[in-house]
């Protein structure tokens, strides 16, 4: 049986481990869409001048993809494999604003296409209703 999202330890879905974890919670999963949350903390390795850097925002999107894959493997395929993914390309990334320490960001990854171990996604980061960043990313999965 699949537990409710709030009972899932997101670190159990990721290959990354602290201090490199850039997602706090899995909020939603479907075949096409995954949603995570992160509270921006001052001690985050990607924080500079009390904001999460663009690099941290890109890693947050990539780790939302990793959480999606971990969820599929653990709860749907039930094989408990944690696969490593690599950012193959980032396109049309627009950073409108870097999130500030204390803000909770919600990241949505929409799967656009999957083929031969590559996944093309559209990622969007919001703080409340405000879009902070959006763009597409290709993720390659190492087998």
Residue ranges and their predicted role:
Residues 2-4, 69-106:
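Hydrophobic beta-strand-centered segment that forms part of the acyl-chain substrate-binding groove
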Residues 16-22, 101-106:
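Short coil-to-beta-strand transition motifs
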Residues 24-27, 91, 96, 110-112, ...:
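Conserved positions in beta-strands of structured domains
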Residues 53-78:
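Active-site helix/loop of acyl-thioester processing domains in fatty-acid/polyketide metabolism
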Residues 18-53:
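Catalytic strand-loop segment that frames the active site of acyl-thioester-processing enzymes
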Residues 35, 67, 100-103, 110-143:
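HotDog/MaoC-like acyl-thioester-processing domains
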Residues 7-17, 78-82:
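Short aromatic-glycine motifs in intrinsically disordered, low-complexity regions
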Residues 23-24, 90, 120, 134:
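Hydrophobic residues on conserved beta-strands that form the core of alpha/beta folds
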